[in-house]
């Protein structure tokens, strides 16, 4: 054994180097992965597929404590964020993750949406989830048929002051553009009972409200326990919410790839889609989830998906314009 070494000192030196490499390797494997996310808006099925060994660092993009969010993100290997909050992210702090595996697995819809971002941004964003908005109707089966056809039903006199809208100017304006009526946005405002994102379904269940527009991923548990509620996806399409993973990690990219691969299993795809979370990957089974027949009660139909829309990033000037427009809209 000693023959390949010229002396005892060289042997010990070589052995010490091997030990250091072994310890470094073990350290990299055992290092806990830190994952920053706002889990209050995630379905249980998604929370369940996050590896148990990963430490979940909770953030709140809706809070005023942005500095705390930044510190948590800087201390995390990966961050989950939706497209509504991407403007709060400093992309220079993240790594590119556009490896061949990631570019090959994405479907056409996700690639098209990524192309709406600047190059330095799109190369650091990996789409991992797509959530459609849904219409939830309470105690009014007659509305379901008209709601399936178009968004025009929102202007019904029966719904005056009985609709709960998301607190998002872009969502509301985009819906108004689908309604066949002059001054549709002002008319929608007159139909609103309130605007809310946090407790929208609690308001619907426990008030005189009849309709709520809410991300599908927040609906499933309420639909199971309250028979008064019906879910509808208009064939005109619905607004879409995108979720992305960003990486700051010095760990092997295989850690992220292995987790991404786990999302492709049929059982995982079934669980996620049943709770309103769709994987934007280009596999036959995943794509079948986007091809449901019309009047399918477990998600949007193919026609609805084809007509649905995403929101490209706003410039600072556009953002200020939307904020001012929204604030003026809320003034009685």
PLM-predicted stretches and their roles:
Residues 76-78, 94-135:
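A structural signal for short loop-to-beta-strand junctions that line the ligand-binding cleft
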Residues 143-159:
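Flexible hinge/capping segments at coil-to-helix
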Residues 2-19:
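N-terminal secretory signal peptides and thylakoid transit peptides that target proteins
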Residues 97-108, 125, 227-239, 248-250:
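Short beta-strand->loop
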Residues 134-142, 240-256, 262-263, 271-272, ...:
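A bilobed periplasmic-binding-protein/Venus flytrap-type ligand-binding module shared by bacterial periplasmic
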Residues 27-91:
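Early extracytoplasmic/lumenal segment of secretory-pathway proteins
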Residues 254, 262-332:
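Extracellular/periplasmic juxtamembrane helices and adjacent flexible linkers that interface
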Residues 83-89, 164-236:
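Ligand-binding pocket segment of bilobal, Venus flytrap-like solute-binding proteins
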